[in-house]
Swiss-Prot record:
Family statement: Belongs to the radical SAM superfamily. RlmN family.
PROSITE patterns per record: RADICAL_SAM
Species lineage: Bacteria, Pseudomonadati, Pseudomonadota, Gammaproteobacteria, Enterobacterales
Official protein name in the record: Dual-specificity RNA methyltransferase RlmN
GO biological processes: rRNA base methylation; tRNA methylation
Organism annotation: Shigella flexneri
């Protein structure tokens, strides 16, 4: 269980009210104790907040009027607002969500048997992966708990209101939007706790996935804080290529990264013994059959399934998209070694909502010193 105290950074209004979306259940119970109330009131309010997407205390009919009045004086339920919506021809929806004076992007991906929400963890990204649009926008700041879980809350409210249109409720959440989640563990972990909590969104730990590019110290801490499904952004079969396209590899190389992954798998039940490998296919960079053989050798001791991701272009990018024939040959080599290999279907590329295309609106792109410091750091992570 993570611990994040209710501090001034949780105060979101000029009147000094606490945003209850910033609190996991443990913190919510402490909040109600401080109000002189029984802790079960926290569970009641959380159920209203997350099961019914309710942000109005007056609508919480099993809460007495006196307590509702007290809550209105000291607290609020404020999710970030959607400022723009784009709908793809394939049913994918991308929302631009206002966080202060910036925007992040959240993507809803419906399928026949599920609906996945891709959630952002930072405004921009500090890791500067060369093939990713988000990285080219620079880095501004970490998102708070309310800004992370608020993306899920806002999407659930929109989708819930649209049930008559047949939109599927959210069944899966992937921390694969803007940012590196492991560089924001103090906010990402409490948000994921709310996703898993029965009084929160009640998702299975196998249906909440965190994706990382390889912040090794933070990955080791993650396993002591929460158990969720893990995906790793590998994208290269050797250090030479990965140093170039995923610069954090210069600090934590592939061998070090995969060793940390195996340590996480030993602790985790959510992953059922194997990790998901994400591998973006860049034309004549990492997509040759020789690269496939190298990748198979590299992963022989790491139980995994492999997702091959056709690269999604963005303006001024230095790469090209691998042809279907090159992807097919690459996939067949991996399968010949016995790896479960899936070529990910591109979704939402007509609205720039596909993998690697999220950019948001990062107002301050000048924080290069902070960005460099954050590369490879697990900053001020608390675990209890």
């Amino acid at each position: 269980m993570s611990e994040q105290l209710v501090t001034p950074e949780n105060v979101t209004t000029k009147d000094g009210k606490i945003n209850l979306l910033d609190l996991n259940r443990q913190q919510m119970r402490e909040f109600f104790k401080d109000l002189g109330e029984k802790t079960f009131r926290a569970d009641q309010v959380m159920k209203w907040m997350y099961h019914y997407c309710c942000d109005n205390f007056d609508e919480m009919t099993d809460i007495n009027k006196v307590l509702r009045g007290k809550l209105k004086e000291v607290a609020e339920i404020r999710a970030p607002e959607v400022v723009e919506e784009q709908r793809s021809s394939d049913g994918t929806i991308k929302w631009a969500i206002a966080v202060g004076d910036q925007r992040v992007e959240t993507v809803y991906i419906p399928e026949d048997d599920r609906a996945t929400l891709c959630v952002s963890s930072q405004v921009g990204c500090a890791l500067e992966c060369k093939f990713c649009s988000t990285a080219q926008q620079g880095f501004n700041r970490n998102l708070r708990v309310s800004e992370i879980i608020g993306q899920v809350w806002r999407a659930a409210k929109i989708v819930g209101a649209a049930k008559v249109t047949g939109q599927r409720p959210i069944t899966n959440v992937v921390m694969m939007g803007m940012g590196e989640p492991l560089l924001n563990l103090n906010n990402v972990v409490p948000a994921m706790e709310i996703m898993l909590d029965d009084f929160g969104f009640g998702l299975s730990k196998r249906r909440v996935t965190l994706s990382t590019s390889g912040v090794v110290p933070a990955l080791d801490k993650l396993g002591d804080m929460i158990d969720v499904a893990l995906a790793i952004s590998l994208h290269a079969p050797n250090d030479e290529i990965r140093d170039e396209i995923v610069p954090i590899n210069k600090k934590y190389n592939i061998e070090t990264f995969l060793a940390a992954v195996r340590r996480y798998l030993e602790k985790s039940n959510a992953n059922q013994g194997r990790v998901t490998i994400e591998y973006v296919m860049l034309d004549h960079v990492n997509d040759g059959t020789e690269h496939a053989h190298q990748l198979a050798e590299l992963l022989k001791d790491t139980p995994c399934k492999i997702n091959l991701i056709p690269w999604n272009p963005f303006p001024d990018a230095p790469y090209g998209r691998s042809s279907n024939s090159r992807i097919d040959r690459f996939s067949k080599v991996l399968m010949s070694y016995g790896f479960t290999t899936i070529v990910r279907k591109t979704r939402g590329d007509d609205i720039d909502a596909a993998c690697g295309q999220l950019a948001g609106d990062v107002i301050d792109r000048t924080k290069r010193t902070l960005r460099k410091r954050m590369q490879g750091e697990a900053i001020d992570i608390k675990a209890v």
